[in-house]
Swiss-Prot record:
Function, in words: Converts seryl-tRNA(Sec) to selenocysteinyl-tRNA(Sec) required for selenoprotein biosynthesis.
GO molecular function: L-seryl-tRNA(Sec) selenium transferase activity
Principal localisation: cytoplasm
Lineage start: Bacteria, Pseudomonadati, Thermodesulfobacteriota, Desulfovibrionia, Desulfovibrionales
Protein name per UniProt: L-seryl-tRNA(Sec) selenium transferase
Organism, scientific name: Nitratidesulfovibrio vulgaris (strain ATCC 29579 / DSM 644 / CCUG 34227 / NCIMB 8303 / VKM B-1760 / Hildenborough)
Similarity comment: Belongs to the SelA family.
One of the GO BP terms on file: selenocysteine incorporation
Pathway noted in the entry: Aminoacyl-tRNA biosynthesis; selenocysteinyl-tRNA(Sec) biosynthesis; selenocysteinyl-tRNA(Sec) from L-seryl-tRNA(Sec) (bacterial route): step 1/1
NCBIfam families assigned to the protein according to its UniProt record, in alphabetical order: selA (TIGR00474)
Length: 469
């Protein structure tokens, strides 16, 4: 074993090999020397462990020139940015793990400008005095939704927390038992309510809640009625929930604010494209609840944000809550949100320019044509290394939206000749950029719904790299 340890090259020898262009690989001369040295030391430590475990038993395999290819791969992998672009071939439009909604070009341009230049973030250009960051989006938000006033924080969970902390702290909030949803990451509505200082008063049964359940629960401690839209799941069969307009009428009669957590939220009706009818933000505002919260980065197709709209008397109270400062959005989110809201002033323009909307409303015929183009490109790029074809399939909206509806699509099927589809899927996670797809029927499949035409070339490159071509 000692002779194997002695056969390991020195750190300096490997550093020289890594930074010398004559070795036929990309050099790492631009990396900080201290970082490069640490990465080489880590690589050598791993080889020492291989020796101890008996995985290496030939001194010649430890020569610098033999180790260099795996060292280059190791350093390249560990020195690149950790937060990276990914090619989404899954067909899940609002993929929570892959960053949810893509921003429209107008929004990305606005973000770039906000990052690169000073701005009037909290400066009133009319008076030359300090202004409010919310003034850039509140009027737009009200115009699009029809609400009296609006506010934006950093996500919808924060919006719900802020609303409950402002209006309900120390009191009881009445909510249907069937609406106590988990919103992802193990965060649940009851947990958010507990943190706000409000006391939860559950009414009804899991599958059925009546107006009388709310009426009977109201007492001297009641401070609000809460309704949570179950956008991330559906109860079917023997089921009943109280319509929003009836709950609003009860709130008015008992002088209690009605809060609607709309979850995903949407400004468009998607029924013309085969999706089930979901309440739009505008229709919910029209029903008259006092406060409505919803997300900015799901069906809306904007940045991560929690949007709060409603009657001015309540929104003004929420704005004055000191917690609002801790939850406020930054200038990049603000820039992206304003640009996205401006697109919604013309709904058809929004449908064409907001990527999430464009992907959700793509027709089956269009997707079939694009799948055939992608398949043809992959056949040319991969040759005999894989069998490429197209098959019918389904996409999903994702992001906790439209949970019960599949979207028809055409999938591109890749069956590698030299490895299993599972191995191919794993290798594709290490390409640049990584390509994420689906495993179905022992094949690797890609959905063109979530791949832009300009991404077809890097998809082909990633597959060639993963197959060693």
């Amino acid at each position: 074993m000692n002779r194997l340890f002695r056969a390991l090259p020195s750190v300096d020898a490997l550093l020289t090999a890594l930074t010398t262009p004559t070795h036929g690989h990309d050099t790492f001369a631009d990396l900080p020397r201290a970082l490069l040295r640490d990465l080489v030391n880590d690589f050598l430590d791993a080889r020492r462990e291989d020796i101890r475990q008996g995985r290496i038993d030939a001194p010649e395999s430890l020569a610098a020139e033999r180790l260099l290819p795996s060292l280059v791969q190791s350093v390249g992998r560990r020195s690149r940015a950790h937060f990276r672009r990914v090619l989404n071939g899954t067909g899940v439009v609002i993929h929570t793990n892959l960053g949810r909604s893509l921003l429209a070009p107008a929004a990305t341009e606005a973000v770039a400008a906000a990052c690169a230049h000073y701005s009037n973030l909290e400066f009133d250009l009319d008076t030359g005095e300090r202004g409010s960051r919310y003034s850039h989006v509140e009027q737009l938000l009200c115009r699009v939704t029809g609400a009296e006033a609006g506010l934006v924080v950093n996500n919808n969970a924060a919006a719900v927390l802020l609303v409950l902390d402002t209006l309900c702290k120390g009191g009881e909030v009445v909510v249907s038992r069937g609406q106590l949803v988990e919103i992802g990451g193990s965060f649940r509505i009851p947990d958010v309510m507990e943190k706000s200082g409000a006391t939860l008063r559950e009414v009804g049964a899991t599958n059925r809640t009546h107006l009388r359940d709310y009426e009977n629960a109201i007492n001297e401690k009641t401070v609000a009625l809460l309704r949570v839209h179950t956008s991330n799941y559906r109860v079917v069969g023997f089921h009943k929930e109280v319509p929003l307009d009836e709950l609003v009428a009860l709130g008015r009669a008992r002088d209690l604010p009605v809060i609607e957590d709309l979850g995903s939220g949407s400004f468009l009706d998607f029924t013309p494209w085969g999706l089930p009818g979901e309440p739009t933000v505008q229709s919910v505002v029209g029903a008259g609840p006092d406060v409505i919260t919803f997300s900015g980065d799901k069906v809306l197709g904007g940045p991560q944000a929690g949007l709060i709209v409603g009657r001015r008397q309540w929104i003004d109270r929420i704005k004055r809550n000191p917690l609002n400062r801790a939850l406020r959005i930054d200038k990049m989110t603000l820039a992206a949100l304003e640009a996205t809201l401006r697109l919604y002033l013309d709904p058809e323009r929004a449908r064409n320019e907001v990527p999430t909307l464009r992907m959700m409303t793509a027709s089956p015929d269009e997707l079939a044509r694009r799948a055939r183009r992608l398949a043809a490109r992959l056949r040319k790029a991969l040759g005999d290394a894989a069998r490429v074809g197209t098959v019918p399939g389904v996409s999903r909206v994702g992001g906790g939206s439209f949970p019960e509806r599949d979207l028809p699509t055409t999938l591109v099927e890749v069956a590698p000749a030299s490895c299993t589809a599972t191995v191919l899927k794993t290798r594709l996670l290490d390409t640049d950029p990584p390509l994420v797809g689906r495993l179905e029927n022992d094949t690797f499949r890609l959905d063109p719904r979530t791949l832009d035409d300009v991404e077809f070339a890097p998809v082909a490159t990633a597959l060639r790299q993963a197959l060693g071509l």
